[in-house]
């Protein structure tokens, strides 16, 4: 189970700064147990990166970066200190081989994706129909 601090940081800092593409990428990597998702460093060799790096590679402000995408996304986009980020600390401590961590993160990511889809559907319903005169 994820700690309350990790869930809070995801919901209040990561998700508001994460693109749909970044969210989808993390979900794909976690679901497949991909070796491209690493821990202990931001980037080992492209395309291997940590959570923040894969999010950074899918964000318009940092997608052009290679090795610096994760740290730059985390510090300049999300406004977090990598040394004190609850998400990064938990990921680095437990790592991608902890199936429970992957499963718990995936559950939170899926909930966010569903929330975004519901908001998008509600917004689409609010769009007034064009009236032809």
Where are these regions (language model features)?
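Short, glycine-biased loop/turn motifs at secondary-structure junctions and
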Residues: 1-133
